[in-house]
Design a protein with these regions (language model features):
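Catalytic helix-loop patch of NAD(P)-dependent Rossmann-fold dehydrogenases
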Residues: 96-100, 104, 140-187, 208
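Conserved Rossmann-fold NAD(P)-dependent oxidoreductase catalytic core, especially the SDR/UDP-sugar
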Residues: 111-157, 180
Length: 327
């Protein structure tokens, strides 16, 4: 456990959601960016995307797998973008040593990198937090829409390890050292890990799938990369901001499965007859119920949280995102 959240008010835990007003993307402003987390899926995809679409961003990356990064000179960079972390946690029956590993990587490392960036004169630090700081998905049949008044309340050590860093790096912000915290929902794209590949496997195998009217926020990797490029080229007035990028539309699990099947040339029938089985599965304690609620539960951000005047990043809709992911 770490104690950066101790004594914080609800407002401090939530943070300053969004910019303080309209912003303007200045594509002529050259920025030097250092990614801390070389070889990561998000870091490498972003680096390639920015290289293709935003030549004003000059990007390097440093490996965080050993301590050699501590000798790196951060002083020539305008922005440090910290992506190193452990995700996709199986939080059941985990020993204390494993939990400590999550805190060392997700909390301690992030804070250490942020302090180094500030000490060496970097102007801006961008931290990848996660929607997981708001807890688990609501179970099947229950709604969950996070808005700007929702207080982060992690359900497990993984979420807490992210929130501790989320709060700690914002505490380091001042007028000369801006901190941007991103709390994205599930990120997916070609080569991604996590829940999406598991869902895609089912879509390619199953002839039928339950018709569940759930609501989930998701973020395609190209939309994230576009968002990152644009926010790196804007100025904002508050020392720290919390940003919530997501796709323009919420996703239903059944709709996503149908689209994956269609892109892969396979017809998946979406039928309501299986819904009672899903309901029963959601009531089973332990891993089965957890998996059912993870797939068919509700976890969405209010769309208004993800609209920023001057930023136009939601370029890829659901159908196109699946085509790019499966193509």
């Amino acid at each position: 456990m770490r104690n950066y959240t101790d004594g914080k008010s609800a407002e401090q835990l939530i943070g300053h959601i969004g910019f303080c007003g309209p912003v303007e993307v200045d594509t002529s402003s050259v920025k030097k960016v250092l990614i801390t987390g070389a070889g990561s899926y998000i870091g490498e995809t972003f680096r390639a995307y920015a290289g293709k679409h935003y030549p004003a961003l000059h990007i390097d990356a440093v490996d965080m797998l050993d301590r050699s990064w501590k000798k790196a000179d951060f002083s020539s960079y305008d922005i440090v973008y910290h992506v190193a972390g452990i995700a996709h946690a199986d939080v059941g029956n985990v020993d204390d040593a494993t939990k400590e590993k999550y805190y060392k990587v997700n909390t301690d490392l992030a804070v250490e990198v942020c302090k180094k960036a500030k000490a060496e004169g970097v102007k801006e630090f961008i931290f990848m937090s996660s929607m997981i700081v708001y807890g688990d998905s609501a179970p099947y049949g229950k709604k969950k829409v996070v808005d700007e008044h929702t207080v982060p309340q992690p359900a497990n050590f993984y979420g807490d390890s992210k929130l501790q860093a989320d709060v700690a790096v914002r505490d380091l912000a001042d007028d000369k050292f801006k901190v941007v915290v991103l709390r994205p929902p599930m990120i997916y794209g070609k080569g991604s890990k996590g829940n999406y590949p598991s869902l895609a496997k089912l879509a390619k195998k199953l002839p039928i799938f339950p018709k569940i009217e759930n609501e989930r926020s998701m973020l395609h990797i190209d939309n994230l990369c576009e968002f990152l490029c644009q926010i790196m080229l804007v100025e904002f007035c508050t020392p720290s901001v919390v940003l919530i990028p997501q796709n323009a539309e919420w996703t239903k699990t059944s709709e996503m499965v149908r689209e994956i099947g269609e892109v892969c040339g396979k017809r998946v029938r979406i039928v309501g007859i299986l819904n009672p089985a899903v309901w029963l599965g959601s009531k089973v304690p332990g891993k089965i119920g957890g998996l059912v609620n993870k797939a068919f539960g509700n976890s969405a951000y209010a769309q208004s949280m993800s609209v920023y005047e001057g930023i136009d990043y939601q370029k890829v809709d659901l159908k196109e995102s699946i085509r790019r992911t499966e193509g």
